[in-house]
């Protein structure tokens, strides 16, 4: 029997963020979590997601002026609340 590793919510959020920011995605997300949630990234839970999504979307908007990309990024993060993407 092959053991499968269960992916954490933080790891799922990193995957989403890396789709938009490449390898810098994890560092970006870690900073958002540490700065705005005052928790370690590994402690991320669904109850923290709305605040994280809000701050991450604001910070992401400072990196691009493309509203469609900002909306897609935000919606992809929101999907973690509903289905864990």
What residue spans do the PLM features occupy?
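Long, compositionally biased intrinsically disordered regulatory segments in eukaryotic proteins
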Residues: 1-85
């Amino acid at each position: 029997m092959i053991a499968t590793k269960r992916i954490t919510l933080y790891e799922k959020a990193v995957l989403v963020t890396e789709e938009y920011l490449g390898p810098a995605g994890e560092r970006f997300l870690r900073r958002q979590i540490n700065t705005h949630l005052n928790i370690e990234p590994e402690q991320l839970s669904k109850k923290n997601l709305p605040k994280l999504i809000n701050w991450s979307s604001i910070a992401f908007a400072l990196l691009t002026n493309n509203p469609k990309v900002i909306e897609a990024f935000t919606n992809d993060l929101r999907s973690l609340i509903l289905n864990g993407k």
